Amino acid sequence: GQGHLESIELTDRDSGECQTVPARWLFVFIGAEPHTNWLENVVRRDDHGFIITGRDLVTSASQHQELPWPLAREPLPLETAVPGVFAAGDVRLDSMKRVASAVGEGAMAVANIHQYLALT
C-alpha cells in the first residue's frame, strides 16, 4: 500500500485458491495452533493439543486417567503432568496468546522451577 496496509492475499491451503481482500490491520497469531504431538503420552494435553498445567491438572483428572497428577501436593501453576516439567506461553491451555504474556509466563516458570527445587 501507500504508507499503510491496504490488502492481504489469502491462499486456501487445500485448494490453492488465492484471493486478495482489503485490510487495514493484520494480527499474527503464531501460537494459535500448538505443535505438541511429540508430547503425546508424556504430558497432559487438551483435545486441541494445548498443554494442561497447574490446578487444571487436578480438576480435569477424571477426564484423563492415563496421565493422572502423581503427587500428594498440588501442582505448581505452570507445572505439567510430569512433576518438574513446566510449560509457558502460547502452548499452554488458557494462556493469553500474546507475546507479553508469554514473556511473563517464562519469568514465572523460572520462579516455579525454584519452588520445585526447594521442594525436592
Where are these regions (language model features)?
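A Rossmann-like FAD-binding core segment of flavoenzymes
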Residues: 1-59, 63-71, 115-119
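Short, proline-enriched alpha-helix->beta-strand connector loops that line the catalytic pocket
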Residues: 23-24, 81-83
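A conserved FAD-binding loop/helix module that cradles the flavin
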Residues: 66, 71-82, 88-120
